[in-house]
Every structure is written in structure tokens, then in C-alpha cells.
């Protein structure tokens, strides 16, 4: 005995209703997960790489040198004398595929630098993820 068309359609309607309830909840979690990844990158990997650079060279990279100074020895002054990098394996991009924003000197104590992700909209706004 097979299923009738009505029974199959009822199953499809039930599955669609369940999907309609679950998908919006998962969509919000994706953005939340990206924000968590950006915060972990900023407070973890990138801060550690910047600290290692500072320990080796006695200072953080300048704003002009940027986070690229963690990948290859900067040629612009002040050229680090004791560069032992690379301090990162690849160019750091936030979960939205954009470069992290690095400012040195920082304007938010107690850090000597400001590090942030501009978030999903890619502009400075309330959705940014910051190290301060």
C-alpha cells in the first residue's frame, strides 16, 4: 500500500512549517557566530601576534605599516631591527572578508593600539567589534 497524494502533501506542509520556524533562528545565529569569531581573532590571534612583534622590536607596528608588518618585515621607517616573523600565516580578514582596522597609537587605553572589525556593514557603526 502506498501513500496517497493528500498524505504526501500533508508531510510536505508539516516539514515546510518546521523549516519556517527553524531557519530564521539559524540566520540570526550566523551573524552572532561571525561576531564571536571576530572578537576571538581580535582578542586572541591578532593581539598575540602584535604582542610578539612588540616583544621582538620594542614597539608595535606603526599605523602606516599596519597589520602587514606581521606578515613581512616593513621597509618603511622605523624599520624593525629584530623582526622574527612572520607572526601570522596569512593576511587577517574579518569573518565578513574585510581587513581588520589597525590604528597606532590607539585612542582607547589601556592598549597602545586600536584594533577592530567594521562588522557586516563595512563602515564604522554600532555593529563594530573592537578591542576596547
Show the residue positions of the predicted features.
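A residue-level detector for conformationally permissive "hinge/kink" positions
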Residues: 8-12, 50, 77, 89
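Conserved hydrophobic/amphipathic alpha-helical signal-anchor segments
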Residues: 22-76
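N-terminal single-pass transmembrane signal-anchor helix
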Residues: 1-26
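Short amphipathic alpha-helical leader/targeting segments
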Residues: 16, 40, 111-112
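Periplasmic/extracellular, small/polar-rich flexible segments of pilin-like filament-forming proteins
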Residues: 55-132
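Generic secondary-structure boundary signal with a strong preference for alpha-helix termini
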Residues: 14, 31-32, 109-110
Amino acid at each position: 500500500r502506498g501513500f496517497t497524494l493528500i498524505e504526501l502533501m500533508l508531510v510536505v506542509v508539516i516539514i515546510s512549517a518546521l523549516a519556517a520556524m527553524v531557519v530564521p533562528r539559524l540566520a540570526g545565529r550566523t551573524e552572532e557566530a561571525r561576531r564571536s569569531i571576530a572578537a576571538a581573532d581580535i582578542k586572541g590571534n591578532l593581539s598575540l601576534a602584535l604582542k610578539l612583534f612588540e616583544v621582538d622590536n620594542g614597539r608595535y607596528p606603526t599605523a602606516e605599516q599596519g597589520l602587514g608588518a606581521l606578515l613581512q618585515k616593513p621597509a618603511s621607517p622605523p624599520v624593525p631591527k629584530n623582526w622574527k616573523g612572520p607572526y601570522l600565516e596569512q593576511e587577517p580578514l574579518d569573518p565578513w572578508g574585510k581587513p581588520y582596522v589597525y590604528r597606532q597609537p590607539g585612542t582607547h587605553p589601556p592598549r597602545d593600539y586600536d584594533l577592530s572589525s567594521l562588522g557586516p556593514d563595512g563602515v564604522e557603526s554600532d555593529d563594530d567589534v573592537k578591542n576596547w
